[in-house]
Amino acid sequence: MSVEIHVNNLGGWPVQEDRLAQACRTVFVEEEVSEGEVSVTLMGDEAIQAMNLEYFDKDWPTDVIAFSLHGADEPVLGDVYLGYQQARRQADELGISLGEELLRLVIHGTLHVIGYEHPEGDGRFECDMYRKQEALLESLSRT
């Protein structure tokens, strides 16, 4: 298995970068993807809001943006951008640790990179991708 995970912490925030990389690898293993490369970048509100506006015409900070950069029958290649400050706000609202929320978001982004999609709106929480995301998060919490 040749999977490369790169974590870039643009704000120098106190996060367990090795756990974020482990979460990406777990998605690859569980989805039986043997080759790929994913770059995970943690960024602040201003930077991720600018990306959200540029690529999705939404002028607010978001929690995760993912881009799949590979073609069919090519090794998985993609970028996952995590909004650190938005993740912290969400963790506070949900009453969970920031670490747990960041793991959830990196799993979510990695699933998008390998090809998963979900509907918009409230129905997205009932789709296969979200169930898979939560199962992967649960399996990581046992390691």
Q: At which residue positions do the language-model features occur?
A:
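An acidic/histidine-cluster motif and surrounding catalytic segment
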Residues: 1-102, 111-143
